[in-house]
Amino acid sequence: MPRIARLPDIVANKISAGEVVQRPASVVKELLENAIDAGATRITVAIKDAGKELVQVIDNGSGMDEEDALRCVERFATSKISDAEELDALTTLGFRGEALASISTVSHFELRTRRENDNVGIQLRYEGGVLSERGKAASEPGTAVSVRNLFYNVPARRKFLKSNATEFKHIFESVKAQVLAYPEIQWQMINDDETLFDFRSSDMHERLNFFFGDDFAGSLIEVHDDNDFLSLHGYVGKPSMQKRQKNEQFIYLNRRVIQNRMLSQALQQAYGELLVERHSPFVLLFLGIDPQQTDVNVHPAKLEVKFEDERSVRTMFYTIIKRSVRMQDFSPDVGGEGFHETSDSFSSRSSQHSDARLGFQAVPSRASSTDDLYREFQESTPKRPMPDRTRVSEQEEMFSHSADIFCEPDREFRSSDFGQVSEEFVDGVRLEPEEKDPKIWQLHNKYIICQIKTGLMLIDQHVAHERVLYERAVDIMDNNVPNAQQLLFPQKVELKPWEFEIYLEICDDLDRLGFNLGTLGTRTVMIEGVPQDVRSGSEAYILQDMIQEYQQNASKLKLEKRENLAKSYSCRNAIMSGQALSLEDMRSLIDRLFATKMPYVCPHGRPVIIRISLDQLDRMFGRK
């Protein structure tokens, strides 16, 4: 067996480069962090051939003398820390002292630097980590680093680089993350001699609109919270801006871009049912915590972070985001954002982190509160006594006449499904004889149209009722509210083996919800009582459908048990498309919808309400 020997520095640096320099974007990230730590107020990034031919970063920071310039390319040489204790109180982005050594080892590396009071600058050139040229050079104050022919001496690594489009996208995303984190810095980016952007002002809105589209900044919700433990500032997106990928989530810890699974999960849970399955919101959030409470020395890439008190960080992060999001009006406008995925962007720190430096501006809110929209509805409809919202069971009775529509959402509906109709219908719209000007109509037995002060409000009757039933089910299970009605004739249901296993898992919560159930043998369930929302005659179908949907939600969404059950219950018991509603039914549904905590989306993230303003109608008809 060969003797153990210490590796030469050049070999060790090549190995280290595999962790630090994974692709051209890694080079860009490390050079930008050095420029920011040097106190630069203007940074230029120039790229050629997606970083394979050239990565150049020029800054007007503090610069270096010749001794420091030579030392900065050595392995584990840094000005950021001097002893191990300082790792517990880092206020800089860089600190490991290995990036430039790793980069210079796998490229043709050039460094030009000058301090402001020096008459001439220093120029150093390295090939494969070896100093090949050293001398004086005319240069502006600051530092310019040029990395050419990346991985020229590591052909295996160069071979596994992706296409130019993919590599450039990673570079652009890395630059974008820093541009958004430091609005006080002027940023310029050049790709293959073409200027992509040149931000000279600190206007955050200008940058957001450039990267994500016109008027993007105006669609955001501002987050601003400080306490003795942490601060959280920035912006989060409305649910209409959600998308499948998480590449538009920017979370910073003391202005260091980070990736943290715990914070990502807390963010998803804070939005909850506002998000469609497997979608994520846009966020640009700056988390400030005492550096002694964090550990960023987890991986050479410095993206991962650990918190000393992870539970407190998660709880506060979740609470602040939820509070900021939940009181907003998310009813989309026709011709506006709608509920869709946002398009891809352009590329298809403790004491330093004050509000003034971040340059945050108040986002002009385009959303009214829930109470404002409900008030518009009330003012635009005839006066009537307000319903007693404590008499939930009586209100729910209005919808108990729905037929077996729960089990067959796509079936055709007949008037006979709903019994004898006594009210007058005109073009499919039901009118009460005592109401000459109802201001509420039902369209195709599917949507409710309401006149409001500023235009029209359209409501999907199924998902509206789903939202009402969902919140009611959660409240019943959490607070043990009596909700059962006994059956005159108990029903027997034969379950499949897998259905019976799920039944055993959720039977206690089914009991809290209002199901009075018993078992016979190994697969038979006796239904002796059901919740008040369940229509007579559909008890067995409802139970089986709830079990099936619960299983689907559990496998796809990984929900909490009670949340899963509440979603299954509300979906299977809500009135469906095709069911005619009386005027009083519609009014009651609207009243109860606006009494919920989140009336604008159903428990699965779909929109409940859409508004059409008079201004939009005027534009459609050419009046404006």
Swiss-Prot record:
Cross-referenced CDD domains, in alphabetical order? HATPase_MutL-MLH-PMS-like, MutL_Trans
Entry annotated with the keyword DNA damage: yes
* Keywords, sorted A to Z: DNA damage, DNA repair
One of its Pfam families is: DNA_mis_repair
One GO MF term on file is:
mismatched DNA binding
Start and end residues of each stretch annotated as Disordered = 336-357
Q: Where is the composition biased (Low complexity)?
A: 344-353
Q: Tell me one GO biological process term.
A: mismatch repair
Give the matching SMART domains.
Answer: DNA_mis_repair, MutL_C
Coiled-coil spans in chain: none
Is this entry keyworded ATP-binding?
Answer: no
May I have one GO cellular component term?
mismatch repair complex
Job of this protein: This protein is involved in the repair of mismatches in DNA. It is required for dam-dependent methyl-directed DNA mismatch repair. May act as a 'molecular matchmaker', a protein that promotes the formation of a stable complex between two or more DNA-binding proteins in an ATP-dependent manner without itself being part of a final effector complex.
Q: Which family does it belong to?
A: Belongs to the DNA mismatch repair MutL/HexB family.
Q: What is this protein called?
A: DNA mismatch repair protein MutL
Could you tell me the gene encoding this protein? mutL
